[in-house]
C-alpha cells in the first residue's frame, strides 16, 4: 500500500478519487481524467510526493482512455510490481519515491520503447513548462 503521507502532499489533501487511485490501487473511469487531453509542454509529477515521472514529449494518444506515455523520466522514477488481479497478468506501476499507485505498463506502445505506461490522471499533477502553473489530475 502507498504511504499515507508525504512532506509535499499529505494524503489528507487528496480528494476521493485521488485517494482511491493512489492509496487503494483503484482505477478512474476511462476518458474521465483531467489530464487525458492535456497537450501542453511540461512535466507530469506524482500527485502525492511531487516526484517527476514523465515528460510531456513522451505522452501520446493511445486511445485507451487514460494518459499514456512511452517512457518515464528515469529508470528509478517508477516501481514495477506483478499484478494478477482480475484473472489476468499485468505489471502495476507505482511512484518510485512514495509508492503511490499510478496505473499499469503494457508492451504495446510506440517506439522507441514499445511500452505503454497507462496512468490514471488522478495520480498525477502537471507543471506547465511555459508558465509553471500546476494542475492536479
Curated annotation (Swiss-Prot):
Keyword match Oxidoreductase? yes
Its gene name is: msrB
For this chain, the family text in UniProt reads: Belongs to the MsrB Met sulfoxide reductase family.
* Keyword set, alphabetical order: Metal-binding, Oxidoreductase, Zinc
Q: Name the PANTHER family on file.
A: METHIONINE SULFOXIDE REDUCTASE, METHIONINE-R-SULFOXIDE REDUCTASE B1
Sorted alphabetically, which InterPro entries does this protein's record hold? Met_Sox_Rdtase_MsrB, Met_Sox_Rdtase_MsrB_dom, Mss4-like_sf
Catalytic residues in the record: 118 (nucleophile)
Task: Give the cofactors, semicolon-separated.
Answer: Zn(2+)
Domain MsrB, residue spans: 7-129
Q: Name one Pfam family in it.
A: SelR
Annotated cofactor note: Binds 1 zinc ion per subunit. The zinc ion is important for the structural integrity of the protein.
Gene Ontology CC entries for this record = cytoplasm
The superkingdom listed in its UniProt entry is: Bacteria
Any GO MF annotation of the entry: zinc ion binding
Q: What is the name of this protein?
A: Peptide methionine sulfoxide reductase MsrB
Note the Gene3D superfamilies from the entry.
Answer: Peptide methionine sulfoxide reductase
A single GO BP term for this record reads: protein repair
Provide the reaction this enzyme catalyses: L-methionyl-[protein] + [thioredoxin]-disulfide + H2O = L-methionyl-(R)-S-oxide-[protein] + [thioredoxin]-dithiol
Question: Which species is this UniProt entry from?
Answer: Serratia proteamaculans (strain 568)
Which top EC class is named for this enzyme in its record? oxidoreductase
Q: What is its EC number?
A: 1.8.4.12
Binding of Zn(2+), residues = 46, 49, 95, 98
Amino acid at each position: 500500500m502507498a504511504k499515507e503521507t508525504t512532506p509535499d502532499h499529505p494524503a489528507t489533501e487528496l480528494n476521493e478519487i485521488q485517494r482511491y487511485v493512489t492509496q487503494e490501487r483503484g482505477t478512474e473511469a476511462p476518458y474521465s481524467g483531467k489530464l487525458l487531453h492535456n497537450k501542453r509542454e511540461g512535466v507530469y509529477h506524482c500527485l502525492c510526493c511531487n516526484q517527476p515521472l514523465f515528460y510531456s514529449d513522451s505522452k501520446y494518444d493511445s486511445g485507451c482512455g487514460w494518459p499514456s506515455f512511452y517512457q518515464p523520466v528515469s529508470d528509478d522514477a517508477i516501481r514495477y510490481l506483478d499484478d494478477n488481479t482480475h484473472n489476468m497478468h499485468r505489471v502495476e506501476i507505482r511512484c518510485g519515491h512514495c509508492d503511490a499507485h499510478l496505473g499499469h505498463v503494457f508492451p504495446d506502445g510506440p517506439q522507441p520503447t514499445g511500452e505503454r505506461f497507462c496512468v490514471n490522471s488522478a495520480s498525477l499533477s502537471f507543471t506547465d513548462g511555459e508558465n509553471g502553473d500546476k494542475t492536479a489530475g
